[in-house]
Amino acid sequence: MKKIRITASLLLLILIFVSCGSSNAAVKRLQQTEEGVSSPTTIDEYKEAIAKYEKRVADITLANEQIGIWYKILGSRYIDLKMWGEALSCYQKAIEYYPENQNLYYYVGVCAGYMAHSALDYDATGSTTKKYNYLKLSESAYLRAIAIENRYVRALYGLGVLYVFELDESEKAIPYLKTLLTIDTGHTDAKSVLANAYFRTGDFQASAAMYDSIIKTTKDKEKKALAEANKKIALDAAYGR
């Protein structure tokens, strides 16, 4: 019985491979019929065949480019609806077509960050692995975006927020936020996150100085009042009050 089962399995595998081979051959014959190319022999026939197949390749390339764009647009639609998981899937697919597009990685970072918030421990196992994995995906996506475009302000800011408020790795946030502020010196929110990072790492003077910068430059009354309150907290910590 064992030999019969093995023989039957081998026959099934052979049939599958033959079927795949037949399918590929059928596709090839269809392509040849569509292009009017069968078995070129002369120089002119080879040139004509190459030209026809190059056009087919160009058409496929154009279609792939459009598919990537549509995935990106669909992802943005899902973001508008706050459907972060669906959006994340779309941006991951878009990256398959545009692997060097920093914006796609940025949005993966954003979506993964939101997905981390919804990754609840529904089985009550006490595990935070799923949440942590989403946060690490967000980190790697932001880092990839910055690797492609090192002056990408939104990715620098997103990474800073992630390190300070989600991963509790404020020391890692500081260089990225400082870089951001050399690019956009008036980025008040980045100053606030950097001040927070300084405070969490024990550099209270630097934290107070950053809050002071916000106080001097912002026109937003609420942000100014918050910076004044936080500056006092930082100075009190610096002088042990």
Where are these predicted regions, by residue range?
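Canonical tetratricopeptide repeat
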Residues: 73, 107, 158, 193, ...
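Structural signature of tandem alpha-helical TPR/SEL1-like repeats
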Residues: 46-55, 81-90, 117-143, 167-179, ...
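Terminal, low-structured helical/coil segments at or just beyond the last alpha-helical repeat
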Residues: 189-192, 196-241
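Residue-level recognition of tetratricopeptide repeat
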Residues: 76, 110, 117, 161-162, ...
